């Protein structure tokens, strides 16, 4: 792997190309996943590869998988690249999805099961079986007692499993990565030292998702002297575009994160990302008959169904008219906020007014050249249903990757 690559983690997020944004219907013969599109089928190059977790495909022990039985059979029969229809130039990585079993006493898998999953998937890279450590020491803080004992227990489990994984995967098709865990920069360093002593040439830094950027950077600074020129370092679950240059400087060679996708529909305000690092709030127009909160209010008689249907229709019509330059910003905002007051209340509507006005006034979708924004226009900033929300997430993924490429281009110019 060359510096710095972005892997997109699979979380069963895809879009239906048959979806009609006016009628809000789809092809009745559509087969989920098989007929849908991943980001790499929408954009020429939104990432360098994909990461798949065993926990997502297989579930936890006897637990529920995110894949249907038919999907799992297809996945294992054809391998990951064929299942995801990945182009030849994209790489593949597998991990265990340790955050899904963080509350268990020990990981729910055996090393042999993990290796079998990686080989059947035909990954390029495989991450050793690990166990998340809770917490990271704050400045002036020092873990002790049972908390420290549990941190050390989980670190020991991870390192023992890493040793076993390295030995048993020697003849496998994938390149092994050993996972480092810690509760401060020193303990992370100890993990990395142990992994390198075992013979690992590639390191993944695990458990960093909850950490502040400063904590991540101080840890990377701590381990940098240990890294050789050919040591590969992967940050599990981390993107942080504002720190791309620092990551590269500190020896990181690859990252993975679903944050750009998740923020499209889980963040309160930062839903639509731009290359400059600014973010916009998507305009919420929930389907009155498909939104659980709204449905409850209608069923309980708090909201009149006919009024809800009328205001929802008015809001959507106003947004489409605005995108066609047939309605003013003021009248569009008025229609949107009328529905907002109904489903979120007067107080919330007033709080969100300025954000909506900024989104609609700036029209960021018109300035974007990505395939999503060009094809669906204002729909990309409407917070409504999975098809719109995921497309906004796909846009965010492409923005992240473009920001990464821009950072890399600046470094190339500096070196020349």
Curated annotation (Swiss-Prot):
Disruption phenotype: Mutant lacking the whole dpd gene cluster does not contain dPreQ0 and 2'-deoxy-7-amido-7-deazaguanosine (dADG) in DNA. DpdA deletion mutant (in a dpdD mutant background) lacks both dPreQ0 and dADG.
Organism domain of life: Bacteria
One Pfam family recorded for the sequence: TGT
Record's keyword terms, sorted: Glycosyltransferase, Metal-binding, Transferase, Zinc
Active site: 95, 256
Keyword Transferase attributed: yes
Record-listed E.C. numbers: 2.4.2.-
List of residues binding Zn(2+): 368, 370, 373, 395
Swiss-Prot/TrEMBL cofactor(s): Zn(2+)
Single biological process term from Gene Ontology: tRNA modification
Co-factor binding comment: Binds 1 zinc ion per subunit.
MF-aspect GO terms: glycosyltransferase activity; metal ion binding
Matching InterPro entries: DNA-guanine_TGase, TGT-like_sf, tRNA_ribo_trans-like
SUPFAM superfamilies: tRNA-guanine transglycosylase
Role description: Part of the dpd cluster involved in the insertion of 7-deazaguanine derivatives in DNA. DpdA may insert 7-cyano-7-deazaguanine (preQ0) into DNA with the help of DpdB. DpdA and dpdB are necessary and sufficient to synthesize 2'-deoxy-7-cyano-7-deazaguanosine (dPreQ0).
Family: Belongs to the DNA-guanine transglycosylase family.
Protein name listed in UniProt: DNA-guanine transglycosylase
């Amino acid at each position: 792997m060359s510096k710095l690559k972005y892997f997109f983690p699979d979380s069963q997020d895809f879009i239906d190309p048959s979806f009609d944004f006016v009628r809000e219907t789809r092809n009745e013969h559509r087969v989920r996943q098989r007929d849908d599109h991943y980001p790499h089928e929408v954009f020429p190059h939104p990432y360098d590869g994909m990461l798949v977790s065993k926990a997502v495909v297989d579930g936890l022990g006897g637990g529920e998988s995110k894949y249907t039985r038919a999907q799992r059979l297809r996945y294992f029969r054809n391998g990951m690249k064929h299942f995801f229809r990945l182009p030849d130039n994209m790489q593949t990585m597998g991990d265990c999805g340790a955050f899904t079993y963080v509350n268990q006493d020990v990981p729910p898998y055996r090393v042999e099961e993990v290796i079998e999953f990686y080989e059947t998937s035909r990954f390029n890279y495989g991450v050793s079986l690990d166990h998340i450590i809770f917490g990271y020491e704050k400045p002036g803080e020092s873990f002790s007692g049972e908390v420290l004992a549990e941190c050390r227990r989980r670190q020991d489990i991870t390192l023992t499993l890493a040793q076993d994984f390295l030995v048993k995967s020697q003849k496998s098709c994938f390149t092994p990565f050993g996972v480092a865990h810690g509760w401060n920069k020193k303990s992370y360093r100890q993990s990395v030292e142990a992994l390198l002593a075992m013979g690992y040439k590639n390191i993944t830094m695990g458990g960093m998702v909850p950490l502040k950027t400063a904590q991540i950077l101080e840890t990377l600074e701590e381990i940098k002297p240990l890294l050789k020129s050919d040591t590969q370092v992967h940050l599990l679950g981390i993107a942080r575009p504002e720190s791309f240059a620092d990551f590269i400087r500190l020896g990181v060679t690859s990252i993975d994160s679903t944050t750009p996708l998740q923020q499209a529909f889980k963040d309160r305000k930062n839903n639509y990302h731009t290359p400059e690092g600014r973010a916009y709030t998507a305009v919420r127009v929930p389907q009155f008959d498909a939104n659980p909160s709204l449905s409850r209010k209608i069923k309980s008689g708090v909201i009149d169904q006919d009024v809800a249907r009328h205001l929802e229709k008015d809001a959507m019509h106003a947004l489409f008219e605005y995108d066609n330059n047939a309605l003013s910003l003021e009248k569009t905002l008025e229609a949107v906020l009328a529905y907002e007051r109904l489903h979120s209340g007067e107080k919330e509507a007033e709080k969100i007014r300025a954000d909506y006005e900024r989104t609609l006034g700036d029209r960021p979708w018109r300035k974007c050249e990505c395939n999503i924004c060009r094809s669906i226009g204002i729909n990309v900033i409407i917070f409504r249903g999975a098809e719109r929300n995921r497309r906004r997430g796909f846009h965010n993924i492409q923005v992240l990757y473009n920001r990464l490429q821009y950072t890399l281009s600046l470094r190339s110019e500096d070196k020349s």
